[in-house]
Amino acid sequence: MGLKADSWIKKMSLEHGMINPFCEKQVGKNVISYGLSSYGYDIRVGSEFMLFDNKNALIDPKNFDPNNATKIDASKEGFFILPANAFALAHTIEYFKMPKDTLAICLGKSTYARCGIIVNVTPFEPEFEGYITIEISNTTNLPAKVYANEGIAQVVFLQGDEVCEQSYKDRGGKYQGQVGITLPKILK
C-alpha cells in the first residue's frame, strides 16, 4: 500500500473528480491552511455546525435523537464558538469520490490540536462518495473558535496493492452520497 503524492492527488481530482472543489495550491496566508500539500490535501470545514447540547441525558448511537444537537449557521460571523468541553459536527466544503483501489485517512491539523481542539473523521473507504462529516471536540476549559471555510484536517491517500473485491459502494454503505452534516445511522 503506497502513500500518494501531490501529483497523483491533483491528477485524480482534476481528471476524475476525486475532490471537488479542488485547490491546486496550499492557501495559508491569514487563514488556517487548506488545499494541496506534498502528500495530502487539507480539507475545509463548511459554515454549518451541529452543537451537541444537554437537552437529553443520553446519547445513543443506535437510536440518536436529533434533538440532542442544535444547528448553527456560522456563515455571517465566519466562525463558530465551540463551548468548553463540548462536541460538534460539521461537514467539508469538498465533495469526495474515492477510487476503488484507494483508502483515505484524515488527521486533525496541528493548529487546532495545539489549542485543544481535536478533529476526528473515520476513513474514506474505497468508492465512498459524498461530503465528509467532521467530528470536533473542544478538550479545554475555555470556549474555542472554529473558523468556517478554512482548513480543519489533512487527508492522506493510500492506494492498495490490488483492487478490493467489495467497495463501500458495493456494500451499499449507509453514508454513501451524504450531503451536509449526517447524524449517526444504524442499518435496520
UniProtKB/Swiss-Prot annotation:
Reactions catalysed: dCTP + H2O + H(+) = dUTP + NH4(+)
Family: Belongs to the dCTP deaminase family.
Protein name from the UniProt record: dCTP deaminase
NCBIfam families (UniProt xref): dCTP_deam
Matching HAMAP family: dCTP_deaminase
Binding residues annotated for dCTP, in chain numbering: 109-114, 154, 168, 178
Keyword presence, Nucleotide-binding: yes
Pathway the protein acts in: Pyrimidine metabolism; dUMP biosynthesis; dUMP from dCTP (dUTP route): step 1/2
GO MF term set: dCTP deaminase activity; nucleotide binding
Function, in words: Catalyzes the deamination of dCTP to dUTP.
Residues of the active site: 135
Gene that produces this protein: dcd
Lineage, broadest ranks: Bacteria, Pseudomonadati, Campylobacterota, Epsilonproteobacteria, Campylobacterales
Subunit text: Homotrimer.
Keyword field: Hydrolase, Nucleotide metabolism, Nucleotide-binding
